[in-house]
Amino acid sequence: GTHSLQDSIMLREFASPHWRDQYLEPLVQGEIFPSFGMTEPDVASSDPTQLQTTAILDNGTWKINGTKWFTTGAARAAYTTVMCRTELDAPSHGAFSMIIVPTDNPGYKIVRETPVLGINGGHYEVKYDNVEVPEENLLGPRGQGFIIAQKRLGPGRIFHCMRWLGQAQRAFDLLCERMHERETFGTPLTKKQLLQKFVFDSACEIQASRHLTLDAAKRIDQGDDARIEIGLIKVVGAEMLHNVIDRAIQVHGAKGLTDDTPLSLMYRHAREARIYDGPDEVHVQSVARRILKNYENNGPGWDFGERDASLVS
């Protein structure tokens, strides 16, 4: 799934040979599952520079203390990659590192599962109580946690958008099929202009999101970090998914609210998409700031085509 793909990219680039040998091949083969610990209950997720979990290096051993939550898949994972504050005197983004913690480690304690919108989706609150791991469990250099996180989250957001496109296609099919099945006042739903607008808007939004996603993926493949393109698709893709499913539910009427179709479950998952991996508001602000920077001091502006790699992204 998405998390395994994200972790395989991260391990390949940043893990020591020992941990690549230990986890990378089993991960790719689907024999083990990963988890990722970044979000904390007492800190706003939109400002991760305030994370409080610490890792202190003492005689070649990291000692980790803190609490994470929304650690997806923690109960079945072989390991968790944990974002920890390791450079206690360093400024903001340079204060954090990524450390691998095997989930069978003493002190790694699952506190509870955290259902989301009534769904038990495998998210957990995890406490790190004097967890000790070797120094070699560090991913990449010290103080590079945010760089590594971005390397993981960037492609991961593209994977999410690809999945959302598949879900939107399913909802679109259900919407159109329902319009052919039902009639009101002697007229099929396919003849209702208002509902035809549902079809038109959904088709436009799905296709626009599809092309935005393909563009972001292409730029990643070309070595661009694609920060702007990824921010765009994270917001536009999540909104598209919500809108298409919402219209499909509306066409199904009360049936769309029941478990007789997959739409009610899809709708709840769609609402999550505007929050996880960064809330919409953070991506909107980040994208706008990066684009505007290209116009400072009579700068080159922003090219929507095959832009110069020197433009800020």
Cite the ranges covered by each PLM segment.
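Short Gly/Pro-enriched turn/cap motifs at secondary-structure boundaries
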Residues: D42-S46, F70-G73, D89-A90, T114-G122
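Alpha-helical interface subdomain recognition
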Residues: F14-W19, P26, G30, L57-W62, ...
